[in-house]
Amino acid sequence: MRTLVAAILLSSVFLHAQTDGIWQGYDPEWSHVSRQLIALAEATPQEKFAWRPGPDVRSTSEVYMHIVIGNFYLLSVTGPKMPAELSSLDMEKTVTGKAQVIDWLQRSLDAVKTAHATAKPADLRRKVKIQGVDADVDGIYLRIIVHANEHMGQLIAYARMNGITPPWSQ
């Protein structure tokens, strides 16, 4: 009897692991990129938030706010509403102070973390439309994490061009 109970328990663990697939690593990876984004923003002096590598290229604050807007927009495609205060895409250009940018960044990172952590496997398989194209919710979450990492690389380059070493590299 104990063998049967053990077999049932083990099979449920393996069955659960199979349904998680790639997504079992999402939450730790999201936490990792979130910590790095916040740490890099905090390590960047206020005056460097206006820095841009050239004309017509996003400034440091604009890159962070682009991540914020992207997080909330992509998350809204999966169901949660965008914050009312996130009035327009112009916030990329109007929210430029370090404290404000970090506050918005943290809010957007937490929103993604909470939404993903509460999603059930069926939620991740649900179909949604984004810009007229069919997608699965899990594909949207993949886009969110790829987008955050893409701009993390950009922000690391900005930091290094300004003599700032990312805190995790010191």
Say what each PLM segment does.
Residues K93-V128, A135-H147:
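Acidic/histidine-rich alpha-helical segments that form the ligand environment
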Residues L15-T19:
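Boundary at the C-terminal end of the N-terminal hydrophobic targeting segment
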Residues D27-S31, R35-I38, Q46-D90, K129-Q170:
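Short, contiguous alpha-helical
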